[in-house]
């Protein structure tokens, strides 16, 4: 079977040698979750907007003499409204069900997935280096981020690939297929941004921080075929899957289990460093350390491009409130706090010159090619048709 699809998805998920196979019943349950999530976005979220702007906000202005001052005050008001309470409950239920239905097919086929991963590693172009002595950061293992069972650091055995398989299929369902067939829109958009913005830039070595299963890593292999590409993450199961997935797609990447705050690479080793939706899944202590490590690892003239959603100063208070629901209902404790951090100031403090730090927008490569807009307004992959990128140069 070349892809897993139904009429609801914007595009079928692209096939590769590690994609977990779902039987008929499992596909039906996965399709239900996808349509359930699509219903929340298309039928309930617009009602949340209307309720706030036409009911909650005017009533508060009448009583208090001023509009709600910030997302926190909006939250205090909206959590009293039954429509928002229903929305928040449905969002949480849909997320927990998502992982449950994907996990069914992974647990059923896990021996085959492990065997496939071993087979892909026998004649590898790239490499996989794990470090069982690595102390996993508390922010990553103290909570199941995205409500994903086991989180990023979960591991069920010495050859386990469960976390990687769960993340790969789960992200596709969570994003409603809008990240493209290979879940790679952030990486593809960032890679295209670098090529368009710096047409003469020829990186010799590239590093992807917090690569998970390599969704955003592989576009850089294609964009810069002459470069040696490395990718790191803290989860061994994620990395086993990432390595096997990349090999099945014919992409040469060197994966290693490392903490992005303190890697074992030498000073100035990379010409290009990238990350995709990493910052908001770290912590107030880790983020400055990651920026300092980025500065250390960049060669003179090197470029770093970190893709994420916009900081709160770039949106109005209501959209801040809607996006901050990820903090409250999707096990993302640093989601809201990160968007209040002055990333430019942190980058300068890490060593980058002020004139070499800027926020830019990287247009969505997938949506531009597909010719359609993003169809949902809340969650990890919203809003708009571009990714906010923090660009730093050394």
Residue ranges and their predicted role:
Residues 9, 14, 18, 22, ...:
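N-terminal auxiliary segments of SAM/dcSAM-dependent transferases
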Residues 166, 180-202:
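Conserved alpha-helix/loop element of class I SAM-dependent methyltransferases that forms part
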Residues 207, 217-262:
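Class I SAM-dependent methyltransferase SAM/SAH-binding core
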């Amino acid at each position: 079977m070349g892809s897993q699809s139904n009429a609801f998805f914007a595009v079928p998920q692209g096939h590769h040698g590690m994609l977990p196979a779902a039987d008929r019943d499992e596909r039906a349950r996965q399709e239900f979750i996808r349509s359930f999530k699509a219903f929340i976005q298309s039928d309930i979220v617009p009602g949340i907007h209307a309720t706030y702007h036409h009911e909650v906000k005017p009533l508060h202005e009448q009583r208090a003499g001023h509009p709600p001052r910030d997302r926190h005050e909006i939250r205090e008001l909206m959590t009293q409204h039954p429509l928002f309470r229903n929305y928040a409950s449905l969002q949480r239920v849909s997320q927990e069900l998502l992982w449950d239905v994907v996990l069914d097919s992974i647990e059923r086929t896990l021996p085959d997935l492990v065997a496939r991963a071993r087979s892909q590693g026998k004649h590898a172009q790239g490499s996989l280096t794990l470090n069982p002595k690595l102390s996993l950061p508390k922010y990553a293992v103290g909570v199941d981020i995205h409500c994903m069972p086991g989180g990023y650091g979960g591991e069920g055995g010495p050859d386990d690939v469960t976390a990687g398989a769960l993340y790969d299929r789960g992200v596709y369902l969570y994003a409603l297929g809008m990240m493209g067939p290979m879940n790679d829109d952030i990486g593809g958009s960032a890679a295209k941004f670098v090529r368009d913005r710096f047409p003469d830039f020829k990186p010799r070595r590239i590093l992807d921080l917090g690569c998970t299963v390599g969704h955003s890593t592989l576009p850089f292999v294609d964009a810069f075929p002459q470069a040696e590409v490395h990718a790191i993450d803290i989860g061994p199961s994620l990395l086993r899957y990432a390595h096997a997935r990349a090999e099945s797609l014919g992409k040469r990447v060197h994966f290693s289990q490392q903490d992005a705050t303190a890697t074992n690479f030498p000073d100035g080793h990379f010409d290009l460093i990238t990350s995709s939706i990493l910052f908001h899944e770290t912590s107030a202590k880790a983020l400055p350390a990651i920026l300092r490590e980025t500065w250390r690892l960049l060669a003179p003239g090197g470029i770093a491009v970190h893709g994420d959603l916009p900081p709160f100063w770039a949106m109005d208070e209501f959209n801040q409130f809607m996006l901050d629901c990820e903090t409250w209902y999707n096990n993302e404790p640093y989601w809201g706090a990160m968007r209040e951090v002055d990333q430019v100031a942190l980058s300068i403090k890490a060593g980058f010159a002020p004139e070499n730090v800027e926020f830019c927008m990287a247009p969505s490569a997938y949506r531009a090619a597909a010719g359609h807009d993003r169809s949902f307004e809340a969650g990890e992959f919203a809003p708009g048709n571009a990714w906010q990128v923090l660009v730093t140069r050394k």
